[in-house]
């Protein structure tokens, strides 16, 4: 976290110490040190005069003891998509004799995500409202939805493939990814932390067949624990990643009370990030919808719908076929106000698979029944702005142009 001036940082640490021995564990302590990583590098140096030690209470055999500590850091280098400065936190568990019995580490970053009311005189557009901030500044999340998919390996993406994806995104001015619709491989978060991509991490909940009707699994109490468990598994696994700036409760899984329980459980663990759940805006911190028309988006900018929170379009500009031609119309509206903090195109990469022509043996990107499979999704899996093998489509270059961070306008040209 950062202080109110976004200058000094504090790191709230919670650690579980488990006694796997048959004897009572006494006199143990945890010591924490911090190392500053070079920008875009895994090389780091120790941060001097930043050290905290906390005693571990007696731990009985087979039991877990939770310890908490706060590490204060003067003027840390802040993490953002533009300057993703990271730190490595090292924890050492020492016994009563001072001997190190276990060491672990994790990547962290100092940044502050806020949703706050803003008076007109403090807004660059002169409009009062409730806006989304990172490190004290409004941001535009220029995003895509991403499935883990590659025609060579299916869903088992390699590290080289993920690295190529990140580089392609950065070159296209993409600064945001919605992990749709499940938490991703740990290495994906590592790369987004390192190179700077704002993530919306999404719980693996999508009872799409029942959608928002009375039969939705979000209603029956029998499914409450499952909803809460999937959300909390995501949070506990990924909470340390500075790249995660939004939590999502799931996708297209209904409006019921089970998501209220999941939201409440999440907030017990992490209040530092806002929570979104597409369309079901009454129970979360920020608004969202899917595939709004350009007319609706322009109307929202004008205040036609009396929406009280910052808005993030979780899916828009469905990139099937010859699509994305009107992307600039969305962004002219989005960039005219801080009411919209951005959105995520559906989607990043085609979900195709390699197949081979029976006559020529030539390999091609197959989909929608090309394997003789029935039923199939037709071309509905081919919505990316890049092909399955990560070759950019024309849409990629359209996105790069519209998502550019600098606008240029001719003035008095002769």
Feature map (PLM): residue ranges:
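Substrate-binding/catalytic cleft of secreted carbohydrate-active enzymes
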Residues: 121, 166-169, 176-385
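Secreted/periplasmic carbohydrate-active enzymes, especially glycoside hydrolases
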Residues: 1-184, 191, 195-196, 230, ...
């Amino acid at each position: 976290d950062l202080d109110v001036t976004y200058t000094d940082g504090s790191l709230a640490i919670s650690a579980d110490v488990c006694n796997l021995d048959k004897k009572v564990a006494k006199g143990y302590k945890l010591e924490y040190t911090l190392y500053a990583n070079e920008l875009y590098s895994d090389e780091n140096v120790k941060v001097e005069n930043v050290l905290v030690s906390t005693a571990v209470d007696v731990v009985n055999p087979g039991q877990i003891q939770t310890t908490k500590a706060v590490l204060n850091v003067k003027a840390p280098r802040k993490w953002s998509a533009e300057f993703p400065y990271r730190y490595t936190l090292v924890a050492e568990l020492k016994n009563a004799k001072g001997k190190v019995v276990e060491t672990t580490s994790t990547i962290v970053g100092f940044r502050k995500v806020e949703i706050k009311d803003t008076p007109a005189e403090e807004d660059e557009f002169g409009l009062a409202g409730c806006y989304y901030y990172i490190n004290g500044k409004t941001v535009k999340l220029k995003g895509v939805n991403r499935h883990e998919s590659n025609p060579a390996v299916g869903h088992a993406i390699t590290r080289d493939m993920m690295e190529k994806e990140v580089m392609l995104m950065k070159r296209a001015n993409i600064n945001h990814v919605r992990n749709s619709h499940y938490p991703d491989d740990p290495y994906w978060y590592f790369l987004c932390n390192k190179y700077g991509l704002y993530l919306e991490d999404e719980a693996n909940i999508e009872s799409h067949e029942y959608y928002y009707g009375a039969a939705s699994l979000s209603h029956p109490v029998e499914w409450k624990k499952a909803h809460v468990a999937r959300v909390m598994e995501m949070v506990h696994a990924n909470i340390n990643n500075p790249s995660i700036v939004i939590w999502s409760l799931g996708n297209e899984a209904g409006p019921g009370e089970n998501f209220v329980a999941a939201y409440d459980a999440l907030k017990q663990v992490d209040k530092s990030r806002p929570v979104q759940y597409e369309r079901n805006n009454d129970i979360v911190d920020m608004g969202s919808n899917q595939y709004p028309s350009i007319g609706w988006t322009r109307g929202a900018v004008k205040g036609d719908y009396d929406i009280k929170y910052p808005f993030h379009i979780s899916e828009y500009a469905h990139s099937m076929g010859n699509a994305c031609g009107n992307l600039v119309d969305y962004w002219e509206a989005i960039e005219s106000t801080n009411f919209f903090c951005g959105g995520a195109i559906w989607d990043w990469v085609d979900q195709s698979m390699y197949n081979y022509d029976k006559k020529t043996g030539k390999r091609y990107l197959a989909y929608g029944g090309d394997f003789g499979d029935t039923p199939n999704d037709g071309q509905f899996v081919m919505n990316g702005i890049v092909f399955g093998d990560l070759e950019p489509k024309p849409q990629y270059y359209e996105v790069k142009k519209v998502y550019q961070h600098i606008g240029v306008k001719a003035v008095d040209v002769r």
